[in-house]
């Protein structure tokens, strides 16, 4: 009985996570500047170069290659930081729906 309940709860949690991932993601060029600044504030990202690159991506909608060339950062590193900000945004979204 306990295992069945655990598996059911795990399935529900996985479905909620998938729903959250699809219904709330930061989209390039669609993030409000104020929301972006708040996300950066709660993140561990402190490099101005990386912050400006992320702003170009999320707020201004520029493509990754152009951003990396302009800000002199590695595409792989930019991808990691994009993922980091996406993860923070998802956590905040999930917290806000638990209240």
Curated annotation (Swiss-Prot):
Protein's GO biological process: regulation of DNA-templated transcription
Gene3D superfamilies per record: 1.10.10.2690
Superkingdom per UniProt: Bacteria
Keywords: Fimbrium biogenesis, Plasmid, Transcription, Transcription regulation
Transmembrane segments: none
A Pfam short name: PapB
Classification via InterPro entries: Adhesin_operon_reg_prot, Fimbrial_Adhesin_Reg
UniProt key word Transcription regulation: yes
Its job: Trans-acting protein involved in the regulation of the biogenesis of K99 fimbriae (FanC).
Protein name: Regulatory protein FanB
Organism per entry: Escherichia coli
Gene encoding the protein: fanB
